[in-house]
């Protein structure tokens, strides 16, 4: 698939015809993921994969993964898409009480995320995790200086991405999908609409959802043997 193959509305129509016989995909996020789930389902359908989707409750990632009796495990997914967005990470970072805590933000967040992966993997062995790495937001405060300032959010976010890649490689059941790279294909202004985040907690615009949904569908297709791709 390519980012120009389908519009979001076309993917939404495709998703309505999916019977869920080929793959079971759960989507967990600390932001709104309803439209993302639709884009994934429609993108899978475009690749010939009928996907059953579970769009879990808003901002219930840890609760769903920690509880063995949650609807996540009752759904028995083949793939779990986990999205911990940069906007919520920024809120947590800004709430850190001192520079000392900010200097270790990436390490602590990576450890927490890896623990979630391990918990899910232990309760749902054989399932694949597709973790959406955070896209870098606009930093009008520190600018380029933030890239070499360890206590800045941009520095910690870049470090977090590296640590998550290392943790995912060690665990073996994680595919790390870099939203920063996808955002670079279409530009930040096209990928992210700040108005939609503050209105509906949506971090990916409808215009960019086909790109993201297609990237996730490509991973699902590769893992199911329907496509050749380095996952």
Where in this protein do the model-derived segments appear?
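Alpha-helical cap/lid subdomain in secreted, periplasmic
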Residues: 15-22, 37-39, 47-56, 62-210, ...
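Terminal, non-globular segments
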Residues: 6-8, 23-24
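Conserved helix-turn-beta segment of the N-terminal RecA-like "Helicase ATP-binding" lobe
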Residues: 44
């Amino acid at each position: 698939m390519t980012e120009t193959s389908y519009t979001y509305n076309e993917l939404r129509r495709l998703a309505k015809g999916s019977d869920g016989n080929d793959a079971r995909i759960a989507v967990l996020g600390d932001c709104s993921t309803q439209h993302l789930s639709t884009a994934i389902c429609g993108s899978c359908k475009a690749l010939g994969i009928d996907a059953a989707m579970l769009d879990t409750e808003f901002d219930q990632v840890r609760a769903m993964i920690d509880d063995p009796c949650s609807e996540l495990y009752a759904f028995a997914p083949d793939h779990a898409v986990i999205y911990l967005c940069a906007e919520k990470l920024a809120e947590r970072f800004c709430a850190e009480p001192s520079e000392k805590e900010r200097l270790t933000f990436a390490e602590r967040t990576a450890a927490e995320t890896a623990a979630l992966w391990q918990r899910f993997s232990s309760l749902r062995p054989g399932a694949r995790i597709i973790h959406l790495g955070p896209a870098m937001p606009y930093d009008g405060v520190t600018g380029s200086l933030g890239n070499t300032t360890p206590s800045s959010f941009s520095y910690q976010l870049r470090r977090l991405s590296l640590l998550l890649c290392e943790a995912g490689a060690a665990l073996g059941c994680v595919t790390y999908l870099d939203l920063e790279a996808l955002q670079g294909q279409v530009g930040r202004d096209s990928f992210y609409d700040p108005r939609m985040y503050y209105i509906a907690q949506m971090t990916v615009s409808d215009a960019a959802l086909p790109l993201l949904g297609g990237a996730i569908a490509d991973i699902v297709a590769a893992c199911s043997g329907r496509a050749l791709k380095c996952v």
